């Protein structure tokens, strides 16, 4: 009997001592919510992850997505072996025509946004973590700035999606991948979605993003330039497609106000002298 008691006692001792958290150490190279979101630098590092998706030149490799000129063979300025293949394939005379007789390649060359809400979820997570973990640990100005940065990138994604697909589901917060009801929710109207974008731009992005947060970093003037573009597009779409005229007017008014932020800054000109683009000593 004594033997069994000793075995049981030994098992209990091992069970209670083996879980001593003195042996637990957080991983130094894998951030978690418990160890991250402590300082403004943490917010900056997380925000840096958005740049490669939205701004050309911040990723590795190269891409022609959203480029106004995707190679000279796309235009009539250049011909290769007597043919302008990219131009003729991208602008066929009839559906399915191409200079090779195959299905026109323009049908597989779409480079705009796909039905993907990854970056919206990333922005929602950003805002939620700021609210839960950083509010009170950083200054109010810093918190408002980074929350507005997250809102800007959320607006960026929704403006793209609405421009391409029209009605899309709007997600106020993130959700678990097991929440099928949220994952497969119905689309919201484009006016509902763009009203959300309008509110974030007007009340947060154009107010709280810093006017200067360092070189090669999002600032209020960059945000205002994009806001003006998005509101101009959606305002004119609503106006000339017989949409919501009240929404059209307020979108266009915000486009004007956002453009004035850029103009009144006195920091930008309509064009940059060509020599300055390639001959600047400080790359500014």
PLM-predicted stretches and their roles:
Residues 26, 162-173:
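Short, well-structured active-site flanking segments
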Residues 34, 61-82, 171-173, 210-225, ...:
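Short, surface-exposed recognition loops and adjoining beta-strand edges that mediate ligand/DNA contacts
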């Amino acid at each position: 009997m004594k033997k069994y008691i000793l075995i049981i006692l030994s098992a209990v001792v091992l069970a209670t001592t083996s879980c001593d958290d003195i042996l637990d150490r957080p991983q130094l190279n894998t951030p978690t919510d418990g160890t991250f979101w402590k300082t403004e630098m943490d917010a900056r590092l997380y925000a840096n992850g958005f740049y490669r998706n939205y701004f050309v030149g911040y990723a590795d490799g190269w891409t022609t997505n959203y480029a106004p000129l995707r190679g000279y063979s796309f235009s009539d300025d250049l011909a290769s072996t007597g043919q302008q293949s990219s131009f003729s394939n991208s602008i066929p005379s009839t559906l399915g025509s191409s200079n090779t007789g195959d299905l026109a390649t323009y049908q597989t060359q779409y480079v705009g946004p796909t039905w993907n809400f990854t970056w919206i979820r990333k922005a929602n997570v950003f805002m939620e973590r700021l609210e839960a973990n950083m509010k009170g640990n950083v200054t109010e100005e810093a918190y408002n700035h980074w929350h507005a940065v997250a809102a800007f990138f959320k607006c960026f994604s929704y403006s793209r999606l609405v421009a391409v697909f029209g009605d899309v589901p709007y997600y106020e917060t993130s959700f678990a991948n097991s929440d099928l009801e949220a994952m497969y929710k119905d689309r919201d109207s484009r006016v509902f979605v763009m009203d959300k974008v309008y509110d974030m731009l007007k009340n947060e992005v154009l107010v709280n993003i810093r006017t200067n947060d360092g070189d090669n970093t999002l600032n209020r003037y960059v945000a205002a330039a994009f806001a003006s573009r998005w509101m101009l597009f959606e305002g004119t779409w609503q106006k000339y497609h017989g949409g919501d005229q009240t929404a059209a007017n307020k979108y266009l008014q915000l486009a004007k106000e956002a453009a004035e932020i850029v103009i009144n800054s006195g920091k930008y000109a309509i064009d940059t002298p060509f020599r300055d683009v390639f001959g600047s000593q400080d790359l500014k």
